[in-house]
């Protein structure tokens, strides 16, 4: 899991009304979110994460840039946020602090090599880079880049059901002394087109832990999109329920996007 995954889920829901469109689309959106939980520490963290994103998409290519701002309280001294979880955790209780600032910038490229046809899902390899732009000294990030490659399967069942599954391998940037490990990430779910305005999405999202000896994140996510225009401009709401000790207890986000 990572915080901005929920923006991606929202885009999947919106995209269900216009899969494989030939006309290029540009999207600008913003998704403020709030998460609360221990994330495997001895403290309760409160995280506000505001993700502003820019996307270009045509029939085969999707490019996306995410520029987040975040604020956290209850973060144990010496620990850092990384990829939607907390690393450099210590077993013993420790003092905590609060911090705010720009987060790690993400750049992603998805390319559809095979469109969905009948029982054959669309095959969509992808690559992502997490630039270590968040402050490592404040614990807002590790200060290191991550690199991720993966494969997505996106299916169409009738005119209303859009199952999807994605798996990826992330090469995790390792600050000195942290001993972080590379991880697998994965999700599976489906969007349901209720009508031309409303899209519902449910998803299980998980990953291995970047820090050995701790639980990886595992989350159940439900999302609702309301499309104001046929192109996909509209509003997005999601709720997250953490299922592991490495996840938040809960998360919620509401935002919107404009598609040109």
Region locations from a protein language model:
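Cleavable N-terminal export/targeting peptides
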Residues: 1-25
């Amino acid at each position: 899991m990572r915080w901005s995954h929920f923006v991606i889920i929202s885009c999947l829901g919106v995209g269900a009304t216009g899969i494989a469109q030939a006309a290029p689309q540009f999207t600008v959106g913003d998704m403020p979110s709030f998460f609360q939980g221990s994330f495997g520490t001895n403290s309760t963290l409160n995280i506000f994460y505001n993700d502003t994103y820019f996307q270009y998409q045509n029939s085969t290519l999707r490019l996306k840039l995410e520029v987040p701002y975040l604020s956290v309280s209850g973060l144990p001294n010496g620990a850092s946020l990384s990829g939607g979880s907390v690393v450099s955790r210590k077993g013993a209780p420790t003092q905590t602090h609060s911090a705010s600032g720009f987060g790690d910038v993400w750049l992603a490229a998805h390319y559809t090599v095979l469109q969905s046809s009948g029982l054959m899902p669309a095959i969509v390899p992808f690559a992502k880079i997490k630039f270590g732009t968040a402050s490592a000294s404040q614990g807002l990030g590790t200060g290191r880049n991550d690199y991720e490659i993966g494969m997505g399967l996106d299916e169409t069942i009738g005119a209303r059901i859009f199952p999807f599954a994605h798996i990826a391998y992330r090469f995790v940037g390792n600050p000195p002394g942290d001993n972080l490990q590379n991880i697998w990430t994965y999700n599976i779910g489906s969007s349901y087109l209720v009508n031309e305005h409303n899209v519902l999405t449910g998803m299980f999202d998980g990953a291995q832990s970047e820090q050995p000896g701790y639980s990886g994140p595992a989350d159940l996510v439900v999302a609702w999109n309301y499309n104001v225009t046929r192109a996909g401009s509209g509003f997005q709401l999601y709720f997250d329920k953490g299922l592991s000790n490495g996840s938040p207890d809960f998360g919620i986000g509401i935002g919107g996007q404009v598609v040109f």
